[in-house]
Amino acid sequence: MAIHYETKATNVGGRKGHVYTDDRALDIDIVPPAQADGKATNPEQLFAAGYASCFNGAFDLILKQNKVRDAHPEVTLTVRLEDDSDSESPKLSVSIDATIKNVISQEEAEKYLQMAHEFCPYSKATQGNINVDLNVNVVD
């Protein structure tokens, strides 16, 4: 299989440390969620940002492939760190909340959102591993 892209990130210090990418485009302190101060981030925020961006790209592509124009999709991804009844360590769950302009029906929007979920590399990577809630609102 062909590799389309590869990147590296290095962390020193775990959840109370620092992370940077090989090109230094990302170079930021890491803190536990309870210690967030606006100057540092945490793994959950980084995951939410990456997944939201990837998913919205997939959603936009699916809409365009199906000749839906001017939908202007927006995706907000909520990441939760929650108790895991099967383990002592917590687990992640996510909600994907998409909004598009009123250019298609709610039913069509839900169909295309599901197609985006099947296409998105983050969704594929997490499939069967975390609970994912999918929601879409069609707005004026």
From Swiss-Prot:
Q: Which domain of life is it from?
A: Bacteria
Check the record and name the InterPro entries matching this protein. Answer: KH_dom-like_a/b, OHR, OsmC/Ohr_fam, OsmC/Ohrsf
Query: Which BP terms from GO are recorded?
Result: response to oxidative stress
Family, per entry: Belongs to the OsmC/Ohr family.
Supply the PANTHER family for this chain. Answer: ORGANIC HYDROPEROXIDE RESISTANCE PROTEIN-LIKE (PTHR33797:SF2)
Q: What is this protein called?
A: Organic hydroperoxide resistance protein-like
